[in-house]
A protein has these predicted regions:
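Short, low-complexity N-terminal intrinsically disordered segments enriched in polar/charged residues
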Residues: 15, 26-50
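Sec-dependent bacterial lipoprotein signal peptides
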Residues: 1-27
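Structured segments of extracytoplasmic/periplasmic soluble domains
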Residues: 43, 47-51, 59-63, 138
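Residues embedded in well-ordered secondary-structure elements
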Residues: 18, 83, 122-124
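Short solvent-exposed beta->alpha transition segments
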Residues: 38-39, 53-114
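Exposed beta-sheet edge and beta->alpha loop/turn motif
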Residues: 96-146
């Protein structure tokens, strides 16, 4: 007669090891996706909030281009003069990343940026604010969707 108890333990052991490997692989994929989303959000925000709008276009979806161009068209020389008096440029950090499939949402804290919220009035330097950015995965890249 054959002892099946040890054979069953072996199968259980391989099952547990297989499950652990699968969980680790899934976790690392999620981590790398989260990092890619975070990098895309920060890259866009750094360019956008430092008024490098042409460079920011490469970080957003084609549908968002018109909104970035509209924002750029409303910047005045007075706004640029205010921005140029600042010793430090705007800085951006991601506080939250949530994603599901090919879409993501981030909360980005932006510090020391020019806030231009009224047409016809000069912008003011804002010490910090939080913004929600939505991103879409296009091919293998994450792009901000305004």
């Amino acid at each position: 007669m054959m002892n099946t108890r040890s054979n069953g333990r072996t199968h259980n052991w391989f099952g547990v090891v297989g499950l652990l490997i699968a969980l680790l692989l899934m976790g690392s994929c999620s981590y790398s996706e989260e990092k890619a989303i975070e990098q895309s959000a920060v890259s866009f925000a750094q360019k956008y909030f430092n008024l490098h709008y042409c460079q920011a276009l490469s970080e957003c979806t084609p549908e968002s281009e018109k909104w970035v161009r509209l924002k750029a068209s409303n910047i005045t020389q007075e706004d640029l003069d205010i921005l140029n008096t600042q010793a430090d440029s705007a800085t951006c950090t991601v506080e939250l990343v949530e994603f599901d499939g090919d879409s993501a949402t981030t909360i980005v804290e932006v510090c020391n940026f020019l806030n231009c919220d009224s047409i016809g009035k000069p912008g003011v330097i804002c010490p910090n604010a939080k913004f929600k950015l939505t991103l879409k995965k296009i091919g293998k890249q994450w792009k901000v969707d305004i």
